[in-house]
């Protein structure tokens, strides 16, 4: 079984409060990945309340972003359109709101699917269970979710498509990819510099 996890492809991370040119550049690649993916798709949405600046994250990153039901919180229109087209084609789409970098709920849902697949196919089929992550930001939410999924599913193949991710800076993107490699997360489509 193969799952695609689209991390935080929201307006504030693309062209809003925390947007970057690198984030804008991956949008067409993420759309193509969604359109061509042959499995279930999960997505996460960074979700904060009006009290964001009073939280630990808000004190350490004092930029209001992804405030629930604002335009910045919404998914990028091109990404949302690709997800909708997949759903219209009867592909299962599962969304998770999260108030922190990683989503334990995402990990739990994928762990349940993994256990079900193992009960049907046996332990020898571990390598057939793959999770592919794309999205923003490589050095914050992508790495957090990748490591969380590795903790929930140590025998599953977890892959990050580097061409469909962007970090806060290009250097932090590269550093996050190296950190994930060290934790036995596979990196595909990495551009050598």
Over which residues does each language-model region extend?
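Gly/Ala-rich phosphate-binding loop of Rossmann-like dinucleotide-binding domains
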Residues: 150
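Amphipathic, non-transmembrane alpha-helical secondary structure
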Residues: 28-31, 35, 111, 143, ...
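Conserved N-terminal glycine/acidic-rich loop preference
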Residues: 100-144, 166-192
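Active-site acidic carboxylates
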Residues: 1-95, 116, 123-126, 155-159, ...
